[in-house]
Amino acid sequence: MARRVFFGFHYERDIWRANVVRNSWVTKDREAAGFWDASLWEEAQKKGDEAIKKMIEEGLKNTTVAAVLIGKETSGRKWVLYEIRRSHEDGKGLLGVYIHGIEDSNGNTDQKGDNSFGEIGTDANGKPVYFWQLYPTYDWADDKGYDNFGDWVEKAAKKAGR
């Protein structure tokens, strides 16, 4: 089944690495969502938080899975956490992918980020739940993401019942 995937990542810092992942996905006749032209992102930032939320909500529409591309500073990004929380609340499949091993435009790799995004919701007893407790995380380089990303997405979708 074809999946439409939302990609969440630290835009300013990791766009090059994120494009490597996205391009590997779309070359296999699949659809990516949540990628914006730099001018759209900058325009939304100028308009404020509500404009950014609206842009994210539009990107999440009709997606079954959200893939969080984890770079060195991703876990501290307000909007990535918002994307994770919305995806979790909506019952989408979720997964994390470490992208530090992908070379940037200058041929450099980066330090590994972490997947401690903070509380993403609560369980039936009102206790906090965290991304790392519920969702799998893969390493693009070590786990052969180019070959396996489609399988990771499918597993996340099935786990979410989608």
Can you annotate each of these PLM segments?
Residues 59-71:
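Short, well-structured hydrophobic secondary-structure segments
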Residues 4-6, 105-162:
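C-terminal interaction surface of TIR/SEFIR-family domains
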